[in-house]
Swiss-Prot record:
InterPro entries recorded: CBR-like, Cbr1-like_FAD-bd_dom, FAD-bd_FR_type, Flavoprot_Pyr_Nucl_cyt_Rdtase, FNR_nucleotide-bd, OxRdtase_FAD/NAD-bd, Riboflavin_synthase-like_b-brl
Descriptive protein name: NADH-cytochrome b5 reductase-like protein
Family: Belongs to the flavoprotein pyridine nucleotide cytochrome reductase family.
Any Pfam family the entry gives: NAD_binding_1
Main location, first listed in the record: mitochondrion
Organismal lineage: Eukaryota, Viridiplantae, Streptophyta, Embryophyta, Tracheophyta
Name of the coding gene: CBR2
Keyword Mitochondrion included in the entry's annotation: yes
Mitochondrion recorded as keyword: yes
Length: 328
């Protein structure tokens, strides 16, 4: 029954990232931490970190006393989560469901991600080398006993290839959560969102939080860019949300449209932003997440220290200030 539902979800919703980390250091238990800058780099989705560590791994059954009976994640220890099922969503995207204690919630907050890691062999000192990658679950944060990850598999992606190799019953090492952006209901009257590809993931967390809360009157405007219509992750889910919630407006644009495509064509332009985003005011917030090239074009990238940095690109030209823009 659960497997059948999961595969229907994959077919019907082409839907798909971690606790203060200091710079890499070892404790007596072999634990290591990451700098805030490292997390920011990872959270952009385009950098990989190859790190070594002792076996700072705790099995989920062992971790219950430390993490509490209702929260599965641990911000300080890597935990193993078992793969329950997987389903193909598109030519390069798969949906993965991982299970844990059915009485517990994952423990993920709105606009936060978790870290995943996979071994890459050993370094010259004989210590395990890892690739570490952040992902945002697409499942309901309040769901008990499981979480879902939508993974775009790249031919040269070390972490995504690790995901592709997993079979039901295999385990994934996970750590978190990491809060990237603190959302509170009605914090702004109007939130604009610009997403590219899998950059839709943190946007979906915020959208879900707003539309699920009848007391939250925030207006949402989303501009979502992809290569082709087939590459639009979460489109059916987003369309349903838009149809059922008048405070959500979505505009899609693709580089390679099909014959019957009715959305925008090409990169997100100044004109698209002008028509699709709220005007720059003190009650406006613009969230941006996507590939580095898109970020530079829209908002400018983050600063060298991975802080938010100066607002540049289209948003600067339209009058948005640093206080009005958040870059994931």
């Amino acid at each position: 029954m659960a497997t059948s539902f999961f595969r229907r979800l994959a077919r019907s919703a082409p839907i798909t990232f971690p606790v203060a980390f200091g710079s890499q250091s070892k404790s007596g238990s072999g634990a290591f931490r990451f700098s805030t800058g490292a997390i920011a780099a990872l959270s952009g989705g385009f950098s990989y970190y190859y790190l070594t560590s002792g076996n700072n791994l705790v099995y989920l059954d062992q971790a219950k006393e430390e993490t509490g009976p209702k929260t599965a994640l641990n911000p300080d220890k890597w935990l193993e989560f078992k793969l329950q099922d997987t389903a193909r969503v598109s030519h390069n995207t798969q949906l993965f469901r991982f299970s844990f204690d059915p009485s517990a919630e994952l423990g993920l907050h709105v606009a936060s991600c978790l870290l995943t890691r996979a071994p890459l062999g050993y370094n010259a000192e004989g210590k395990t080398k890892y690739v570490i990658r952040p992902y945002t679950p697409i499942s309901d944060p309040e769901a008990k006993g499981y979480f879902d990850l939508l993974i775009k598999v790249y031919p040269d992606g070390k972490m995504s290839q690790h995901f592709a190799s997993l079979k039901p019953g295999d385990v994934l090492e996970v750590k978190g959560p990491v809060e990237k952006f603190k959302y509170s209901p009605n914090m702004k009257k109007h939130i604009g969102m610009i997403a590219g590809g899998s950059g839709i993931t943190p946007m979906l967390q915020v959208i879900d939080a707003i539309v699920k809360n009848p007391e939250d009157n925030t207006q949402i405007s989303l501009l979502y860019a992809n290569v082709s219509p087939d590459d639009i992750l979460l489109k059916q889910k987003l369309d349903v949300l838009q149809a059922n919630h008048p405070n959500l407006k979505i505009f899609y644009t693709v580089d390679n449209p099909t014959k019957n495509w009715k959305g925008g064509v090409g990169y997100i332009s100044k004109d698209m932003a002008l028509k699709g985003l709220p005007l720059p005011t003190d009650d406006t917030l613009i969230l941006v997440c996507g590939p580095p090239g898109m970020m530079e074009h829209i908002s400018g990238g983050k600063a060298p220290d991975w802080s938010q940095g100066e607002v540049k690109g289209i948003l600067k030209e339209l009058g948005y200030t640093e206080e009005m823009v958040f870059k994931f």
